[in-house]
Amino acid sequence: MNIVHTIKDVKSIIKKWKDENLSIGYVPTMGYLHEGHASLIKKAREENDKVIVSIFVNPIQFGPKEDYSTYPRDLDKDSSLCEKFGADLVFNPETSEMYPNKIYSHVNVDILTENLCGEKRPVHFQGVCTVLTKFFNILNPTKAYFGEKDAQQLTVVKKMVEDLNFPIEIIGCPIIREEDGLAKSSRNAYLNKQERKSALILNKSLKEALKSLKSGEKDLNIIKNIIINTIMKEPLAKIDYISIVDSTTLQPVEKLQSSILIAIAVYIGKTRLIDNFTFKL
């Protein structure tokens, strides 16, 4: 497995692969990799001749009061995981490589970014879409792999690729959880022992909502209140948002319909965690 840090070097390798007509699977990450990322790499390995993982903590998708400077980083550990699960190449550029000058061009996806994390983190998806556009242009992958834990991101990226005619297939992969149900996240590393225990309230609240839906409850206000009331029992938890939206348009819905996404963001102490599930009639 190779690790490269410059656009010139990564393009040189990719040109050789393309000349041999090899398919390329791409897994974009910000590093501090876990089993969720591993599942994406494994899926890419199964479906492509070559696999690239990018590791880049993208500054332009963080707001001024967010955790860019403290976001966990461990390239050695990440590289070992990438190699273990079948990556051929790790692209780990410096910020100055991706943004050598002040950036004036940005990619925005409207409507789909109005709610959920897009509402709470105003610059986030502009930063995500801009950096992914750069990576897609640099790496020219056949397929790119994203986790369903970031459900809004997955929907936004699919729409961006469709609208801008990128010749890339976007693949969504299931949420990977700890044995006790907590969704795998790099930010779980911020949690102390008590917070880690308290974080289970996210999955617990969603399970209660799903149980009620499966029992025939159709009133989405009742479903939302089940989630709120469950989370409020946990003293360390502070709700950022609870949203019930159409799983395709990400617009709020008031009545149960064919496919809904229930997504939540909750602060456990100072750490913001997200989780979700899709329910289909």
UniProtKB/Swiss-Prot annotation:
GO terms for molecular function: ATP binding; pantoate-beta-alanine ligase activity. One of its GO terms (cellular component) is cytosol. It is found in: Cytoplasm. Beta-alanine binds at residue 61. (R)-pantoate binds at residues 61, 153. Coiled coil: none annotated. InterPro entries: Cyt_trans-like (IPR004821), Pantoate_ligase (IPR003721), Pantoate_ligase_C (IPR042176), Rossmann-like_a/b/a_fold (IPR014729). Its main location: cytoplasm. ATP binds at residues 30-37, 147-150, 176, 184-187. Disulfide bonds: none annotated. The active site is at residue 37. It catalyses: (R)-pantoate + beta-alanine + ATP = (R)-pantothenate + AMP + diphosphate + H(+). The reaction proceeds by a bi uni uni bi ping pong mechanism. NCBIfam families: cyt_tran_rel (TIGR00125), panC (TIGR00018). This is Pantothenate synthetase. It comes from Clostridium botulinum (strain Loch Maree / Type A3). The lineage of its organism: Bacteria, Bacillati, Bacillota, Clostridia, Eubacteriales.
